[in-house]
Amino acid sequence: MIERCLGAYRCRRIQRALRQLKVTILCLLLTVVVLRSTIGAGKFGTPEQDLDEIRQHFHARKRGEPHRVLEEIQTGGDSSSGDGGGNSGGSNNYETFDINKIFVDEGEEEKPDPNKPYTLGPKISDWDEQRSDWLAKNPSFPNFIGPNKPRVLLVTGSAPKPCENPVGDHYLLKSIKNKIDYCRLHGIEIFYNMALLDAEMAGFWAKLPLIRKLLLSHPEIEFLWWMDSDAMFTDMAFELPWERYKDYNLVMHGWNEMVYDQKNWIGLNTGSFLLRNNQWALDLLDTWAPMGPKGKIREEAGKVLTRELKDRPVFEADDQSAMVYLLATQRDAWGNKVYLESGYYLHGYWGILVDRYEEMIENYHPGLGDHRWPLVTHFVGCKPCGKFGDYPVERCLKQMDRAFNFGDNQILQIYGFTHKSLASRKVKRVRNETSNPLEMKDELGLLHPAFKAVKVQTNQV
């Protein structure tokens, strides 16, 4: 019937099309079955869900292919043995990386001749003349940068390698930030050292070769201010009474009675002191240094210091005990140029200060520098960069945070902020913003302090 109506030719074409349609449908069904079995579609879902899963599968695969290529490249890079390229291999995890792998000590240290006495360098006897000539020839670098305002270089530093505990370097960063803030406010230059200039003078004594080198390299400096890395400024407004020291070459926190009469090894502190740049200072360094070389010399000197100084424990010679011994036994040679400062805290022992910060805030104000508001809080014995300290780690770190925030609040108040508490890293706003910011009053006078250096072109030698 169909053939009569459509004709034989058309009928054969329709039959051929139907057969092709059957084959197409069969192929489609087979494709769906294969996809459902290989990519996980069809888990009791509807055809619509199957279609969504198929789309997601191909989309995820398309996104994953570039990552797979990168992973293959990184894997290939890990197996390479390049010397310094960006893909030289190794883990991306800083926490698990052994930092000691990148430290290379090139060659052995040069050993000194044991038959020769130790010296910091060639003997210099005319430094005052050399320095005076230099200052006269370089008037743009005066040693006094304001009336009774000497040019001062604050020097501090730390070891060339990272600290021996996970948080030590963080506290070193806080300490140097604190010192930078004080120096910026008071017109003081700063030098941070991380190099051991003389292997023989490691530990307590490392400061001596550095101090001598800086004095000779910077004749424009009138005073060098050494400060240990574990000491922090806690009175940002206190300006040192420079006029008081016009006739002195060395200023240390201490007491005459404890040093000269009692010979007490803690009668002064060498963690924060001022040294004038002159011939007297070079002579003092030359006299101070011979107890410092590590090994037998330092050990034997330690025995002498323990025997001669009051209450000193038995340990190798340290720079502080050596200074007490030097002043007590050679007072006529050095004492008349040494000022032992007890009027304010050029060094303030942290154990008697940190628990009183809130009381200070309530009753006193910055700018006093003494027990009411200490200029410096020194964390003697905490050793935040070492493996072990002399005090509980938790107490040391908590109090170092409090001391930092105590000083930092004086900086933040300039800009209208303060720490939420002395124990908090977070800050809060303490005054509202204004469209006339220059009319805001700086309560502590630290934004443009009167004591900040004003450069003049006159030399005072």
Swiss-Prot record:
Glycosylated residues (UniProt): 432
Reactions listed under catalytic activity: Transfers an alpha-D-xylosyl residue from UDP-D-xylose to a glucose residue in xyloglucan, forming an alpha-(1->6)-D-xylosyl-D-glucose linkage
GO terms, molecular function: protein homodimerization activity; UDP-xylosyltransferase activity; xyloglucan 6-xylosyltransferase activity
Key words of the record: Glycoprotein, Glycosyltransferase, Golgi apparatus, Membrane, Signal-anchor, Transferase, Transmembrane, Transmembrane helix
Compartments reported by the entry: Golgi apparatus membrane
Membrane topology label: Single-pass type II membrane protein
UniProt main location, coarse: Golgi
Residue spans, topological domain Cytoplasmic: 1-20
Lumenal side: 41-461
Region of interest: Disordered: 74-95
UniProt note: phenotype after gene disruption: Reduced xyloglucan content.
TM helices/strands, residue ranges: 21-40
EC annotation from Swiss-Prot or TrEMBL: 2.4.2.39, 2.4.-.-
First-level EC class: transferase
Superkingdom, natural source: Eukaryota
Pfam families to which the protein is assigned, alphabetical: Glyco_transf_34
Function: Xylosyltransferase specific to UDP-D-xylose that accepts both cellopentaose and cellohexaose as substrates, with a better use of cellohexaose, to produce xyloglucan. Adds preferentially the first xylosyl residue to the fourth glucosyl residue from the reducing end of both acceptors. Transfer one xylose mainly to the second glucose residue from the non-reducing end. The acceptor should have a minimum of four glucose residues. Associates with other xyloglucan-synthesizing enzymes to form multiprotein complexes for xyloglucan synthesis in the Golgi.
Subunit details: Homodimer. Interacts with XXT1 and XXT5. Interacts with FUT1 and XLT2.
Record protein name field: Xyloglucan 6-xylosyltransferase 2
